[in-house]
Structure formats: structure tokens, C-alpha cells
Amino acid sequence: ALKVSMKDIADYLGGLPEAKMHCSVMGQEALEAAIYWYRGIPLATHDDDDEGALVCSCFGISESKIRRVILESSH
């Protein structure tokens, strides 16, 4: 389950409009967080550094992480 990507999630849903691709990013992060929690593995927290603005405090998702995932998925 940790190998499920945001693209896998979007594909499973029959595709997502570009404006909603962030939803699959959040879905992938939520799945990863749930697996880590189930296994008792602590999640890394977001520190105020060069990671950019914190977008999702529940999962510690920064703006730069979302941008990175979008760039990776566009290849």
C-alpha cells in the first residue's frame, strides 16, 4: 500500500481535472500516514525551514512538496 502513488489514486478515480490533482496528493499522504500510524512509526513533522508554506497541518504537507509531486507526476 505504501507504493500507491497520487497518480494511482487519480487513475483509480477515473482521472482528475488539473485543478483537483492536489486531492490525490492529499489522499496518498493520508494513506501513508494511516499505514505509519498502524505500524507505530512516527511521522516526520514539518519544521519552519525552506520547505515553504505549510498547506496541510494534519499531514505536514508543504507547498514545495505539493509542487514537487506535481512536477514528478507530469513526466
Swiss-Prot record:
Entry's Gene Ontology molecular function annotations: iron ion binding; iron-sulfur cluster binding
GO biological process terms on file: iron-sulfur cluster assembly; nitrogen fixation
UniProt xrefs under InterPro entries: NIF_FeS_clus_asmbl_NifU_N
Cell division found in the keyword field: no
SUPFAM superfamilies, per the entry: SufE/NifU
Keywords of the record: Nitrogen fixation
Similarity comment text for this entry: Belongs to the NifU family.
Protein name: Nitrogen fixation protein NifU
Organism (species): Nostoc commune
